[in-house]
């Protein structure tokens, strides 16, 4: 009898695992299809995204595939469309939702930097700067420091901005393009910032 119970439990485990794997694959495929539709709505050939459709599809991703990468990429597009429409509060809310519960560290940092730019556009550079405090992965160090420099320039803190731009430059690999960053440093040196 224990042998039959063991075999039955093993079969249940195997078939349960296979069922779970199939469910996960179907969920991923479904999210991928909705995300593809969102991309098509956001990147209309006319240059004008279908705002209503983008919002509807992003809500579908959030509701049906919550916490997935696709749902958060959808939120990034909603934020982009909101910025283009001048709805900075809506963009900030979308980005904040990713920062609060990111699907992974890369999405968290991407959303954090975009949110900082939105806050800066709302004349909230201090809040944006505070958002960028803390540890950062080396892959994002240069872009975060450059953004800090931009925010510090906006706040009129040229010396601190120069230091941030230097940190950004130091964080770049030797073969990275530093043209734009060097122009910002040169502008600060001339006092044009």
Language model feature labels by segment:
Residues 84, 121, 154, 187-191:
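Register position in tetratricopeptide repeats
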Residues 42-51, 59, 69-143:
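Alpha-helical adaptor scaffolds
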Residues 137, 156-176:
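TPR/TPR-like (Sel1-like) alpha-helical repeat modules
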Residues 28-46:
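Short extracytoplasmic/periplasmic juxtamembrane "stem" segments immediately C-terminal to an N-terminal membrane anchor
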Residues 2-23:
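Single-pass alpha-helical transmembrane signal-anchor segments
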Residues 177-193:
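Extracytoplasmic/luminal low-complexity segments enriched in Pro/Gly and acidic/polar residues
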């Amino acid at each position: 009898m224990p042998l039959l119970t063991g075999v039955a439990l093993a079969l249940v485990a195997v078939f349960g695992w296979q069922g779970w794997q199939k469910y996960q694959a179907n969920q991923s495929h479904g999210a991928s299809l909705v995300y593809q539709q969102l991309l098509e709505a956001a990147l209309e050939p006319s240059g004008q995204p279908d705002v209503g459709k983008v919002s509807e599809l992003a809500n579908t991703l959030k509701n049906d595939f919550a916490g997935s990468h696709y749902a958060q990429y959808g939120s990034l597009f909603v934020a982009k469309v909101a910025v283009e429409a001048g709805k900075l509060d809506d963009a900030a809310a979308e980005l904040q939702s990713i920062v609060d519960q990111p699907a992974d560290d890369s999405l968290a940092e991407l959303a954090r930097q975009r949110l900082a730019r939105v806050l800066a556009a709302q004349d909230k550079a201090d809040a944006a700067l505070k958002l960028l405090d803390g540890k950062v992965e080396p892959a994002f160090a240069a872009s975060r420091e450059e953004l800090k420099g931009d925010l510090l320039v906006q706040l009129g803190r040229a010396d601190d901005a120069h230091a941030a731009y230097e940190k950004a430059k130091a964080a770049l690999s030797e073969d990275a393009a530093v043209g734009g960053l060097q122009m910002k440093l040169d502008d600060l040196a001339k006092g044009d910032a």
